[in-house]
């Protein structure tokens, strides 16, 4: 048993602040929180926290780790006047240039930086059309190396190679889900990685692909992870070719349920939002990505039952993401305040609970010991009623001191327990090679 002694225990939702308490952890689970636990458990080891903030682990609920080597990209990118041209000229060339090495180092770098930013878990959405089979296992290797809890999937699409590409994407999703099932039975590795069934977006998945995805969801017991209504084009395409709203079309194939994760959703219809809520599915808002891609703003956030936050590939700094989500909402005239976005941030843990079959997101006995530990010397009182305001206007990822995942300190006193410099050096080489491959693509 390990006791984190003298902590400031903070929950964002339901909001709660307890100063000077201890947290007792047995294996990967919290067993007690309260005063003087070292007296109750005299044989336990302990770490003195000196009043540091300890909160339930932070989750990035939608990310693209395959884009980790795109920072400062020097490949020749044609002008991108709109969202679709941005996809075609940048992202759909980058993902075609990925190979096993570049994907592995992209996964490593993104995992390292997620943890340094305070994330204990990331929900990833992957694409590498030239390297489909085995790609999700490569990402899993990166997650396990660093100690990050994660979910991933392959974004099924027909955009490069038609029905063959659809089949290969679905097969990789199924293969990976079954690999996870076998790994859980073997218990030789920590259960840190789970699977979704992935799809790119409705406008690149025909009905034949949705039927394949329905069968994959049914066969594996996993939920769908898909972009939808990120841009008006997706909605117009669905109306023109299928005569249906986006989520209504997905629901026709039994793809909207309590494990479904829909990213973006800026232009979902009122009926689609009702459907999403009735099926208890999740919408993940990616404020900075929407701003960067100039796709518009989601004016319906207050109507969403299960709202979570993600980055869509712009790092994994969820402190920053929550700030932008709130500020952009205010700029757009929205009605929500910081506490609503703090709740959305914590909702990522509900996604973990639904998919890992365990309890995440509270500092209570029986919950997973996934914890974010911060140095934050507040200049004003830190209270349950104002903790969301402290994050919106002050506390950031620079305060992250340590991160615990599954009861293990994977990042302690701002250090990993392995050499990171060599990983970054190799990542730079892999990035340069990938950029050259991008330039060689038509």
From Swiss-Prot:
Q: Give induction info.
A: In stationary phase.
- In Pfam terms, one family for this protein is Amidohydro_1
Q: Which residues bind Zn(2+)?
A: 62, 64, 227, 312
Name the Enzyme Commission number(s) assigned to this protein.
3.-.-.-
Ordered alphabetically, the record's keywords are: Hydrolase, Metal-binding, Zinc
Mind listing the GO molecular function terms for this protein? hydrolase activity, acting on carbon-nitrogen (but not peptide) bonds; metal ion binding
Q: How would you classify this enzyme at the top EC level?
A: hydrolase
> What's a BP term from Gene Ontology annotated to this protein?
negative regulation of cell growth
Domain of life of the organism encoding this protein: Bacteria
- Please name the NCBIfam families in this protein's record: PRK07203.1 (NF005540), Se_ssnA (TIGR03314)
Instruction: Please report which protein family the annotation says this sequence is part of.
Output: Belongs to the metallo-dependent hydrolases superfamily. ATZ/TRZ family.
Please give the name of this protein.
Answer: Putative aminohydrolase SsnA
